[in-house]
Amino acid sequence: MSDELNYVDWFRHSSPYINAHRGKTLVILIPGEAFESPNFSNIIHDLALLDSLGIRLVLVQGARPQIDRALGNRRLSSRIEDGYRVTPQDQLIDVIQASSAVRVQLEAQLSMGLSNTPMANAGLRVCSGNYVVARPLGVVDGIDYGHSGEVRRIDRDAIFRLLEDDNMVLLPHLGFSPTGEVFNLKAEDVATQAAIQLKADKLIIFTEDEGIFDQKDELFSELLAHQADTILAQGSLSPETRNALEACLMAVRAQVPRSHIISFNENGGLLSELFTREGSGTMIDEDSYERLRLATIEDVGGMMQLLTPLEDKGILVRRSRELLENEIERFIVIERDGAIVACAALYPFEQERAGELACVAVSPEYRGSNRGERLLKGIEAEAKKQNLDTIFLLTTRTAHWFIERGFKETSLESLPAKKQALYNYQRNSKIFAKKL
C-alpha cells in the first residue's frame, strides 16, 4: 500500500510539470552508447510515454561505438580531430551501414506493441528522411576530413508537418548535400542545430554521466552559461561530456530556453528530469541579463522567494507552492542573471471578457526602474491576445500606482460573478479596472 501511495503522491506532484510540457517540442540526442545500455528499453518506454502526453519529439541518433566496431572488423583505424571523426572515402560505407543498423534498431524498438508491456497499443509513428542538409568540413589546419561534414540547414517545414500529424521524427547523424553526397556528421551538432532551427523548447542529451559535477563530486542540478564556460575552460570533462555541454551551451545561447544532460543508464532519468522538482541531471540555462517572459515550472522556487515576504506582510494573498505550480501558466516573470526579480499573473474570465491582474511583485532591490511598468504592459499584451476587454485588480496598498496608469476605482458588483463570490471582506481590498 505504501508503494501505491508513493506513486499517487508522485503523480499528483508531477501533474503541473506534465501540463507545462504538453505541446512542447523536445530534441533528444540518443548517442550510440545508449543503445548498448541495459537501460535502453526503459528509455524507449519513457519516450512512448512522453509521446502519449502530447509532447512533440525529435530524436537524434548517434553511432560512435558501432562505427568503431565496424571499422575494427575491417582492421581500419579511425582518427578523431577536434571532436570530429575523419571519414575517408573507403570508410564511408562502414559509417553508413553502422548508422543504418542503429536507426533500424531504434525504429524497431519504437514500433513494439506487445501486450503486457509499457509499449502495448502505443501506436507510435516514427519518420526519418533526408531532413538534414549538410556540407563538407573540408580541409582544416591541413587535415582533410573527407566525408565528414557539418549541418547546413534543417528542413524545418517538413519536420513541422510531421510533428503536427503526431509523428515522432528521427534524425540520424548523416546529412545530404544538394549534389547527392552523404556526410558523416557529429550527432551533437545535428541535435543542436535541430533545436535551434526548430525553435525547440528543450534540448536533451543522454550521456553516460549523470550530468556535470563540481570539484567535490556533487552534481550540478542547474548551470548558468557563464558557469558552464568556467567548467569547459578547466578541461576536466570526458570528451563525450564536453561535447554534450558545448552543445547545450550553444543551444541556450541561440534562444533554446533550456538544455539538459542526463544519464542513459538511470532508469526513469528522463521522466525525473522533466517531471520532478529535483530532476536527475544537469539543466543549462542562459545568463540572460534581464528579460520578460512567460513563467515556467522551473521558476516556482524563485517566485516563492519573491512572494513570501509580501505575503508575510499581508500585501499579497498567500499562495502555496502547489498552487503556484498548478497556475504557473498564468504568470509572467522578469528574469535577471538567472534570478526571478518580478512577477505578475493574469486570471481570465472569458465569459465576461475580463481578466484579473494579480500577484504583482518586484524584488525590493530592483524597484524604481520601471519593472512594474514592464509587468503591466506584459499582462495587458497577454490580455489582448486572449481577447479580453478589461483588466481589474484588488489592492490594499498600491492604489495610487495603478491610478497613475489608467485604472479607475469600481464597485464589487462590476466584477465577474465568480470573483464576487470569492471577495474577502476582511481584507476590504479596493477594486480598480482598466479598459484595454
Which residues are covered by each model-predicted region?
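N-terminal glycine-/serine-/threonine-rich phosphate-binding loop
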Residues: 1-58
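Polyanion-binding loop/helix "lid" in catalytic or ligand-binding cores
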Residues: 40-43, 88-118, 156-157, 163, ...
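Short amphipathic alpha-helix that is part of the acyltransferase structural core
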Residues: 287-317, 428-431
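A conserved beta-strand-loop-helix scaffold within acyl/acetyltransferase catalytic domains
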Residues: 317-363
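Conserved beta-strand-loop-alpha-helix junction that forms the acyl-donor binding cleft
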Residues: 391-403, 408, 413-419
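Conserved acetyl-CoA-binding loop-helix of GNAT-fold acetyltransferases
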Residues: 362, 368-385, 393
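Ligand-binding beta-strand-loop-alpha-helix segment within the catalytic cores
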Residues: 72-170
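C-terminal "cap" of GNAT-fold acetyltransferases
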Residues: 415-436
